[in-house]
């Protein structure tokens, strides 16, 4: 952990964006310590450092990450496919519920996006967004309901927030004058449908580079 800043330093000082995979609270501390050290060396006010997975974290870490200007990119499939197993055989209910704390991240002002980690999870954005909005395990247990995202934030996690983290929000991620008309036409309004049913919404058309 004490070498993370060493490895990131040349990219940081060159003005590059940093993306780090981190899955537990010890790892989160190590990455945040490195970001704090590098910010002291070379302040950067739009560095958009992204913590991928953000698996197990604390409220204090979420607040600190936000204060340091970090973003998180989470994988809700851990909740769906491994949540029950983590509760029963590994972490227990309390600690397993700390996985993928997207709700806290948003409340603390961080950008939250979603990835599938293919082949760990499928390339199904509506399913991924649904899991972040419901936090339902495979057996239907809701893990830490306070960490659910709103419908808006869950859908933003696969659109504008993902674009922002890629530094492509000036081109894609939302419909606006001067941006590409990338869009998907659905057969139902996800804001009028329960988030648990989002995976069942049919895709009628997709426009790319419009």
Model-derived features: positions:
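C-terminal accessory/binding modules appended to enzymatic or scaffolding proteins
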Residues: 4-6
